[in-house]
């Protein structure tokens, strides 16, 4: 296919128009007084949101060269979202500012490669300053503050801090759409997996249709159980001890299942059987997790163990087990804390090493189940449009909170970036590298400038006042006052602020050094050609 090529200033201006089209759509959402953007959907109601990355993903421009610029900035927002989960609007605003200032200097004759080196050195210096001044986050109140700022709602902040308190910082917190109007937190304590009882005859509570076992033994195996003789020795020992039993196996069928049900109906002893969770190698790993959590052993031929030789000390224990039609929950397993801790460390190491997003997600689920349970935030709202918007805000706030726990917090409202700009004074560079540093210095003001503009203030006056105030003193756009941001609870995760700047500078520097754009020539006569081709079908009339 034929290509169209543009060079030099024409190429850079086309990219800049695309960058501006996307950035102007996103920047109006920044800050507590930012506006919403309505996104049209082919199916269903339009989506109303103030989430930068969601808006960026929807934008595609007709002009192929302008679209390249828009897609490059979209990459800034997407990468920041992937790394930190929030800060996508800040990253977009920073990228636009660096590109705008950079292109001015390139047009005036500066060397783009020199500017690029200056930008990289400046960003490194600012990131060091952000990391140095980040404060670790410990208290429940601090977690609530971070979540509240990100979501723009104090109630959501409290909900997320409650969830983190209950399931721990490594715990899984999921966000789901609720049926009703209220947004609430539901916590599943202990380990839960998606397998229910094999027969409804095993239930102990007919009202709730669930089986509850108190202080039971747990037999864990990766084998199929078909003959009762395989498990008879261990069953007899459990009956003698007067305890209940949970069997987790690949499957239980035929004579073995019938015998267990018969004993339950006669009241001889209570036993519930469930299938093992997961598939293949993941199933083996999950069975091992359950064994470590409950202090049992997986009966598997890989370890040279046979079902008929199982002894009672190979069985796991737990305070309580709840089994419904679809899931099993193990509460307070009796495993050794040291063993659980080393298993958690091993899974964390696997998470760091894996390159597959799917594997990482599954490993994080396993980690959460071992580390203390799962919290579900159920999002309620009056309309579906409101629910979707609220769900996006909660997901952003959750990601921001995790980032804050990881690397600490800095003053919010764009204040940390203006403070960090002072670190650039120590860089003694010359020529175009010095110009690169000046570009970053100006760009660091842009988020604060935009927050002030969205609140109806003159951005340059606000920036000047914040720069002359002490470190950490910023502009609270909500109360329209200048105050200590951290003391006022206006904080941003250091990881979000750092990632936004690094990703913005990376893409902006690449764009400044672009000299040529190549694109397909849009075909103008596709529709006409197709219709002309169909014209020949008129001759088919003679076939009748």
UniProtKB/Swiss-Prot annotation:
It is found in: Cytoplasm. The keyword Secreted does not apply. GO terms for cellular component: cytoplasm. Its EC number is 5.6.1.7. The keyword ATP-binding applies. Its main location: cytoplasm. ATP binds at residues 29-32, 86-90, 413, 476-478, 492. It holds the Pfam family Cpn60_TCP1. GO terms for biological process: protein refolding. One of its GO terms (molecular function) is isomerase activity. It catalyses: ATP + H2O + a folded polypeptide = ADP + phosphate + an unfolded polypeptide. Keywords: ATP-binding, Chaperone, Cytoplasm, Isomerase, Nucleotide-binding. Signal peptide: none annotated. Forms a cylinder of 14 subunits composed of two heptameric rings stacked back-to-back. Interacts with the co-chaperonin GroES. NCBIfam families: GroEL, PRK00013.1, PRK12849.1, PRK12850.1, PRK12851.1. Belongs to the chaperonin (HSP60) family. Together with its co-chaperonin GroES, plays an essential role in assisting protein folding. The GroEL-GroES system forms a nano-cage that allows encapsulation of the non-native substrate proteins and provides a physical environment optimized to promote and accelerate protein folding. HAMAP family: CH60. This is Chaperonin GroEL.
């Amino acid at each position: 296919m034929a290509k169209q090529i543009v060079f030099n200033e024409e190429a850079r201006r086309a990219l800049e128009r695309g960058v501006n089209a996307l950035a102007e759509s996103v920047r109006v959402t920044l800050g507590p007084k930012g506006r919403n953007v309505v996104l049209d959907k082919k199916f269903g109601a339009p989506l109303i949101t103030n989430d930068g990355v969601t808006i960026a993903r929807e934008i595609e421009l007709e002009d192929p060269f302008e679209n390249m610029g828009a897609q490059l900035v979209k990459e800034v927002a997407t990468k920041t979202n992937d790394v930190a989960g929030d800060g996508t609007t800040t990253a977009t605003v920073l990228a636009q500012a660096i590109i705008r200032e950079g292109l001015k200097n390139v047009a005036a004759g500066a060397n783009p490669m020199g500017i690029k080196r200056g930008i990289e050195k400046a960003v490194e210096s600012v990131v060091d300053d952000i990391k140095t001044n980040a404060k670790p986050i410990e208290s429940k109140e601090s977690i609530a503050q971070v979540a509240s700022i990100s979501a723009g709602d104090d109630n959501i902040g409290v909900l997320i801090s409650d969830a983190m308190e209950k399931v721990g910082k490594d715990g899984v917190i999921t966000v789901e759409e609720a049926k009703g109007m209220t947004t609430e937190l539901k916590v599943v304590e202990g380990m839960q997996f998606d397998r229910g009882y094999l027969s409804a005859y095993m239930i102990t509570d007919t009202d709730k249709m669930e089986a509850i076992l108190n202080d039971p033994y747990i037999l864990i195996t990766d084998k199929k159980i078909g003959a009762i003789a395989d498990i008879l020795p261990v069953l007899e020992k459990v009956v003698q001890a007067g305890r209940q039993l949970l069997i987790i196996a690949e499957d239980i069928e035929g004579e073995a299942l019938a015998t267990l049900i018969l004993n339950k109906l006669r009241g001889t002893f209570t036993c519930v059987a469930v299938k093992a969770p997961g598939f293949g190698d993941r199933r083996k790993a999950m069975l091992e997790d359950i064994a470590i959590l409950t202090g049992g052993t997986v009966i598997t031929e890989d370890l040279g163990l046979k079902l008929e030789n199982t002894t009672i000390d190979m069985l796991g224990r737990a305070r309580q087990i709840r089994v419904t039609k679809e899931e099993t929950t193990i509460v307070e397993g009796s495993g050794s804390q040291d063993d659980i801790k080393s298993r958690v460390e091993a899974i964390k190491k696997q998470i760091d090493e894996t390159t597959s997003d799917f594997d990482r997600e599954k490993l994080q689920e396993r980690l959460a189940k071992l580390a203390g349970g799962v919290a579900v935030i159920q999002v309620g709202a009056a309309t579906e449009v409101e629910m979707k918007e609220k769900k996006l805000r909660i997901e952003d706030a959750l990601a921001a909170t995790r980032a804050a726990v990881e690397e600490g917090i800095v003053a919010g409202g764009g204040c940390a970036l203006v403070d960090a700009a002072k670190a650039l004074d120590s860089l003694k560079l010359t020529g175009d590298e010095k110009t690169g540093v000046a570009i970053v210095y100006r760009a660091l003001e842009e988020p604060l400038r935009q927050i002030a503009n969205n609140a109806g203030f003159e951005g340059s006056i606000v920036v000047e006042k914040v720069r002359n105030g002490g470190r950490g003193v910023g502009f609270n756009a909500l109360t329209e006052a200048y105050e200590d941001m951290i003391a006022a609870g206006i904080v941003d995760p250091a990881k979000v602020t750092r990632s936004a700047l690094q990703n913005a500078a990376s893409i902006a520097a690449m764009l400044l050094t672009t000299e040529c754009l190549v694109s397909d020539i849009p075909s103008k006569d596709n529709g006409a050609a197709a219709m002309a081709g169909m014209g020949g079908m008129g001759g088919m009339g003679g076939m009748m």
